[in-house]
Amino acid sequence: QHLADYDEVDDDRAKLHLDAR
């Protein structure tokens, strides 16, 4: 599972992506 490894990064990037969009 990639998300498991990038759980924290995904959460941080997810917010940035949503904000950017």
From Swiss-Prot:
Its main location: secreted. Cleaved by the protease thrombin to yield monomers which, together with fibrinogen alpha (FGA) and fibrinogen gamma (FGG), polymerize to form an insoluble fibrin matrix. Fibrin has a major function in hemostasis as one of the primary components of blood clots. In addition, functions during the early stages of wound repair to stabilize the lesion and guide cell migration during re-epithelialization. Was originally thought to be essential for platelet aggregation, based on in vitro studies using anticoagulated blood. The modification Sulfotyrosine is found at Y6. It comes from Odocoileus hemionus (Mule deer). Conversion of fibrinogen to fibrin is triggered by thrombin, which cleaves fibrinopeptides A and B from alpha and beta chains, and thus exposes the N-terminal polymerization sites responsible for the formation of the soft clot. One of its GO terms (biological process) is adaptive immune response. Heterohexamer; disulfide linked. Contains 2 sets of 3 non-identical chains (alpha, beta and gamma). The 2 heterotrimers are in head to head conformation with the N-termini in a small central domain. Keywords: Adaptive immunity, Blood coagulation, Coiled coil, Disulfide bond, Hemostasis, Immunity, Innate immunity, Pyrrolidone carboxylic acid, Secreted, Sulfation. This is Fibrinogen beta chain. The modification Pyrrolidone carboxylic acid is found at Q1. One of its GO terms (cellular component) is extracellular region. It is found in: Secreted. A long coiled coil structure formed by 3 polypeptide chains connects the central nodule to the C-terminal domains (distal nodules). The long C-terminal ends of the alpha chains fold back, contributing a fourth strand to the coiled coil structure.
